[in-house]
């Protein structure tokens, strides 16, 4: 068995990635989220495939086809809610994974980090298009508002929006193409994830101390496979608690009303995992400025490696930087809350302050903390 594992061309790749992979002996549970993201992706592809067998991407029948899945298809309701809530867990794991990378300085693996950012954008695009497919009120108006942001691009904006819509408004053509892209993107994400792992295995994993762990490596299997199974069981438990007890907890009640272009919902808002970016978008009165801030709120991750001023890689032994990191986390929670609130006083002011804080912490306070810590350690 050992010989086949180490000699067969295909088995050798699996062996070097998941079995005999030399792994630092001190990585914590924060390193569990990579494998959980892989599980989430597989789960989403499988549930999505079964949903696509019964879904129709036509404005006249999309909403009723989703109802049909929930009422008439065998276990359709559980597949539908596993897919919807699976997306929420996917994003929870994503945010934890990115946060861990920022805290422990994993962004110094520049190729792995940049492909990770590309993966984040791809998953966000997929989730947005998936939210449009049930063709409820929030699906329709969410699609209208978000695609309309492209009209802020000077000169070509309006043409670009109409090209994406396939007409003069969000309609049948838009829904059909969103379904096509929503179906193909997870496979592109899978390919990107494989490249993400390829680059990670070129350097080996980082560890909480941020120091080289070449002296102390252990095989991935059985030590971390068994550790990952615990994370997997917890993930499935949380997912099934959500699906079986409160499947609509994270959804919007407006999406149970069929899409109506003549009736605008009082508060148009995206799913909870986009609310932080939506709050940043809304905090700037200018349309183009808001769109740029929205893009930069994610793209700022790409310049984090350039802003690393500390002589230590990880934040494990840097209390000042730790304070800044947790301040950023609290700030993101405030932005998420504000994104779901109506545009009125005092939420507008809180949103603007939180948006300013978000960019200030990342661009100014964190690099300054690193410099101060270097001086305190007389480096």
UniProtKB/Swiss-Prot annotation:
Keyword presence, rRNA-binding: no
Protein name, UniProt field: Cytochrome b
Binding site residues for heme b b566: 97, 196
GO molecular function, one term: ubiquinol-cytochrome-c reductase activity
Cofactor binding notes: Binds 2 heme b groups non-covalently.
Organism name: Hemigalus derbyanus
Subunit and interaction comment: The cytochrome bc1 complex contains 11 subunits: 3 respiratory subunits (MT-CYB, CYC1 and UQCRFS1), 2 core proteins (UQCRC1 and UQCRC2) and 6 low-molecular weight proteins (UQCRH/QCR6, UQCRB/QCR7, UQCRQ/QCR8, UQCR10/QCR9, UQCR11/QCR10 and a cleavage product of UQCRFS1). This cytochrome bc1 complex then forms a dimer.
Record-linked PROSITE patterns: CYTB_CTER, CYTB_NTER
Family per similarity comment: Belongs to the cytochrome b family.
Membrane-topology descriptor: Multi-pass membrane protein
Alphabetically ordered keywords of this record: Electron transport, Heme, Iron, Membrane, Metal-binding, Mitochondrion, Mitochondrion inner membrane, Respiratory chain, Transmembrane, Transmembrane helix, Transport, Ubiquinone
């Amino acid at each position: 068995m050992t010989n086949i594992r180490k000699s067969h061309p295909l088995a050798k790749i699996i062996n070097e990635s998941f079995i005999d992979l030399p792994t630092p002996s001190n990585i914590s549970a924060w390193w569990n989220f990579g494998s959980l993201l892989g599980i989430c992706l597989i789960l989403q592809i499988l549930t999505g495939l079964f949903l696509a067998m019964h879904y129709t991407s036509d404005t006249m029948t999309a909403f009723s086809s989703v109802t049909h899945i929930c009422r008439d298809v065998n276990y359709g309701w559980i597949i539908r809610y596993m897919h919807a809530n699976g997306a929420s867990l996917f994003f929870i794991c994503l945010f934890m994974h990115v946060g861990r990378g920022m805290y422990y300085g994993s962004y110094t693996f520049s190729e792995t980090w940049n492909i990770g950012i590309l993966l984040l954008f791809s998953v966000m695009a997929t989730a947005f298009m998936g939210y449009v497919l049930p063709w409820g009120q929030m699906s329709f108006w969410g699609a209208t508002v978000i695609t309309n942001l492209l009209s802020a691009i000077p000169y070509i904006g309006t043409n670009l929006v109409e090209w994406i819509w396939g007409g003069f408004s969000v309609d049948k053509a838009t829904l059909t193409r969103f379904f096509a892209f929503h179906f193909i993107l997870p496979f592109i994400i899978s390919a990107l994830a494989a490249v993400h792992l390829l680059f990670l295995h070129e350097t080996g994993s980082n560890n909480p101390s941020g120091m080289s762990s070449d002296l102390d490596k252990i095989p991935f299997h059985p030590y971390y496979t068994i550790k990952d199974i615990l994370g997997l069981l917890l993930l499935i438990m949380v997912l099934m608690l959500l699906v079986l007890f409160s499947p609509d907890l994270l959804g919007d009640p407006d999406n149970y009303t069929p899409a109506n272009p003549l009736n605008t919902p009082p508060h148009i808002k995206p799913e909870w995992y986009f609310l932080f970016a939506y709050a940043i978008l809304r905090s700037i009165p200018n349309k183009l400025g808001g769109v740029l801030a929205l893009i930069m709120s994610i793209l700022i991750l790409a310049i984090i490696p350039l802003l690393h001023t500390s002589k230590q890689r990880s934040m494990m032994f840097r209390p000042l930087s730790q304070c800044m990191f947790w301040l950023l986390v609290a700030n993101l929670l405030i932005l998420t809350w504000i994104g779901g609130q109506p545009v009125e006083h005092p939420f507008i002011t809180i949103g603007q302050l939180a948006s300013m804080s978000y960019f200030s912490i990342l661009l100014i306070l964190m690099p300054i903390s690193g410099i101060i810590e270097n001086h305190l350690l007389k480096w």
